[in-house]
Structure formats: structure tokens, C-alpha cells
Swiss-Prot record:
Entry GO terms, CC: cytosolic large ribosomal subunit
Gene3D superfamilies: Ribosomal protein L11, C-terminal domain (1.10.10.250), Ribosomal protein L11/L12, N-terminal domain (3.30.1550.10)
Entry GO MF terms: large ribosomal subunit rRNA binding; structural constituent of ribosome
Stated role: Forms part of the ribosomal stalk which helps the ribosome interact with GTP-bound translation factors.
Ribonucleoprotein listed as a keyword: yes
Gene source species: Photobacterium profundum (strain SS9)
GO terms (BP aspect): translation
Sorted UniProt keywords: Methylation, Ribonucleoprotein, Ribosomal protein, RNA-binding, rRNA-binding
Protein name, as recorded: Large ribosomal subunit protein uL11
Pfam families reported in the protein's UniProt record: Ribosomal_L11, Ribosomal_L11_N
Keyword hit for rRNA-binding: yes
Assigned protein family: Belongs to the universal ribosomal protein uL11 family.
Post-translational modifications reported in the UniProt record: One or more lysine residues are methylated.
HAMAP family in alphabetical order: Ribosomal_uL11
Length: 142
């Protein structure tokens, strides 16, 4: 018989840096999950990801207080800012450009995000990533 799902918890945690402090501790604590067990498992699973990148995670909590979790790829905006070498996007994206990304960088980000995106093909995903870049005030070259 399958376990009864009690809750789904969605968080963004820095890769390799999960610790019991907020936001992780309170979110898991209110469902009775072993916080340190999650932190150790999450940090082990995100070893291959660049340290510090915000990584979305969906935690499924069961009625017996056990849990499973799925890590996703970092948000496209974070990957675009890293590729362009800027700290933040533009406050006025249509008039004020803050950086540039090449078509090759957009392709690389689309391939990274392919597992989480629901695009028909890589070209559709590239267009989606390029749209995100433009809405952040980045110029897409190529």
C-alpha cells in the first residue's frame, strides 16, 4: 500500500548549502520532518551543481514523517545573469540594457533547463530563454 502524502513543500535552496536555518528549518519543522537528514541528503545530491546556485526543490512529506525530494535546475534568470556577468536585471528592460548573451549561451542554458521545461523542441526552449533574457534587459546576440 502506498504511503499517504501529507504535504508538498516547494523551496529554493542554495546548492550545497542547505542548513536548518530559515527558510529550510521552519518549512520542514512544521511538518515534523527530520531537518538534518534532509540537509545532508540535499547537499549530497547537489554536489555536482555549482555551489551557491539557488536550486528549486519539491519535498513530498508522508504521513509517517518520511520524505522524498526532487531537485530541479536553477531558474533561467539566474543562469542568464551568470552568463551575462551581471548582478541583476534591468529595472526598465525595454529602454535600459544591462548586458548581452550570445546565442551559444542561450543554447547551453536551454539544454541545461531541458529536463524541467515543457517545450516541444530545443528551438522552442531557446526562444523561451531568449524572451526571459529580453525581459531582464539583456541583449541576445546571434
Amino acid at each position: 500500500m502506498a504511503k499517504k502524502v501529507e504535504a508538498y513543500i516547494k523551496l529554493q535552496v542554495a546548492a550545497g548549502a542547505a542548513n536548518p536555518s530559515p527558510p529550510v528549518g521552519p518549512a520542514l519543522g512544521q511538518h515534523g520532518v527530520n531537518i538534518m537528514e534532509f540537509c545532508k541528503a540535499f547537499n549530497a545530491r547537489t554536489d555536482s551543481v555549482e555551489k551557491g546556485l539557488p536550486t528549486p526543490v519539491v519535498i513530498t512529506v508522508y504521513s509517517d514523517r518520511s520524505f522524498t525530494f526532487i531537485t530541479k535546475t536553477p531558474p533561467a534568470a539566474v543562469l542568464l545573469k551568470k552568463a551575462a556577468g551581471v548582478k541583476s536585471g534591468s529595472g526598465r528592460p525595454n529602454t535600459e540594457k544591462v548586458g548581452t548573451v550570445t546565442d551559444a549561451q542561450v543554447q547551453e542554458i536551454a539544454e541545461t533547463k531541458a529536463a524541467d521545461m515543457t517545450g516541444a523542441d530545443i528551438e522552442a526552449m531557446k526562444r523561451s530563454i531568449a524572451g526571459t533574457a529580453r525581459s531582464m534587459g539583456l541583449v541576445v546576440e546571434g
